[in-house]
Swiss-Prot record:
Residues 7-21, 92-108 have a biased composition (Low complexity). Residues 1-28, 52-114 are annotated as: Disordered. Its main location: cytoplasm. It comes from Mus musculus. Suppresses the insulin receptor and EGFR-transduced MAPK signaling pathway, but does not inhibit MAPK activation by a constitutively active mutant Ras. Probably impairs the formation of GTP-Ras. Inhibits Ras-independent, but not Ras-dependent, activation of RAF1. Represses integrin-mediated cell spreading via inhibition of TESK1-mediated phosphorylation of cofilin. Coiled coil: none annotated. The Cys-rich domain is responsible for the localization of the protein to the membrane ruffles. This is Protein sprouty homolog 4. One of its GO terms (molecular function) is protein kinase inhibitor activity. Keywords: Acetylation, Cell membrane, Cell projection, Cytoplasm, Developmental protein, Membrane, Phosphoprotein. Residues 167-274 form the SPR domain. It is found in: Cytoplasm; Cell projection, Ruffle membrane. The gene is Spry4. GO terms for cellular component: cytoplasm; ruffle membrane.
């Protein structure tokens, strides 16, 4: 019985590994014609995939320059690595692969945390420390009204040439007797109103208001005892006949005269300005440092 003939006459090296593709029993005969490749064990490389973010976070992935269209391809530069960050391929074949990979990941995580951690607060020096507080500046509001007249010429600067009193509108206007509105601002309480109601003249005014023409009702109702205007004789005749029934109407004229006298006396006491008529006015100029006034020589 003959010994079996070996399929390959190549001696087997214990330090080498035969690498051949898996053959399927149903593969065609042409695939069996490829030669077998024998690689020594020191030339074999592992399929370890490096992660630049974990293994070496300080190095950013370098992007290769763009190749111009139609030109030869350029090789991307390989980023420089430190000796401490190089991961050898033969480490995975050692007896402790899990311990080496875990230590590498731990050191990479520590370097990543150290890189991302902010510097201590004590080492951060401010560019410029504020030692003095800003001063408060009090700004005056802008005067948008324009230049105003001097205080001594603001008002009361027109004086009468005869009596020397002020001739401004506020001082020269006549002063009336005090009056007020009563009954929910419906009735005026004044001296003349009290005379009208006390002497029953309000009744006569109401009759003239409703019985006269529309053109004359205003003058007749407001001034029933006037000697001018229309229907003067008719008005006085009617009031004379009515005074027989209402004798209080006879007191209307004396009471109205008393109100006029009281108005003049009150105006003389309360009006501070000039009461002269047809007199010239002069401009009062205040002397500097003195409260007395001096009159100008140019009246107007």
């Amino acid at each position: 019985m003959e010994p079996p003939v070996p399929q390959s006459s190549v001696p087997v090296n214990p330090s080498s590994v035969m690498v051949q593709p898996l053959l399927d029993s149903r593969a065609p005969h042409s695939r069996l014609q490829h030669p077998l490749t024998i690689l020594p064990i020191d030339q074999m490389k592992t399929s370890h995939v490096e992660n630049d973010y974990i293994d070496n976070p300080s190095l950013a992935p370098a992007t290769g320059p763009k190749r111009p269209r139609g030109g030869p391809p350029e090789l991307a530069p390989t980023p420089a690595r430190c000796d401490q960050d190089i991961t050898h391929h033969w480490i995975s074949f050692s007896g402790r692969p899990s311990s080496v990979s875990s230590s590498s990941s731990t050191s990479s995580d520590q370097r990543l945390l150290d890189h991302m951690a902010p510097p201590p607060v004590a080492e951060q020096a401010s560019p410029r420390a504020v030692r003095l507080q800003p001063k408060v500046v009090h700004c005056k509001p802008l005067d948008l009204k324009g230049p105003t007249a001097p205080p001594e010429l603001d008002k009361h600067f027109l004086l009468c040439e005869a009596c020397g009193k002020c001739k401004c509108k506020e001082c020269a206007s006549p002063r009336t007797l005090p009056s007020c509105w009563v009954c929910n601002q419906e009735c005026l309480c004044s001296a003349q109103t009290l005379v009208n109601y006390g002497t029953c003249m309000c009744l006569v005014q109401g009759i003239f208001y409703h019985c006269t023409n529309e053109d004359d009702e205003g003058s007749c109702a407001d001034h029933p005892c006037s000697c001018s205007g229309s229907n003067c004789c008719a008005r006085w005749s009617f009031m004379g006949a009515l005074s027989v029934v209402l004798p209080c109407l006879l007191c209307y004229l004396p009471a109205t005269g008393c109100v006029k006298l009281a108005q003049r006396g009150y105006d003389r006491l309360r009006r501070p300005g000039c009461r002269c008529k047809h007199t010239n006015s002069v401009i009062c100029k205040a002397a500097s440092g003195d409260t007395k006034t001096s009159r100008s020589d140019k009246p107007f």
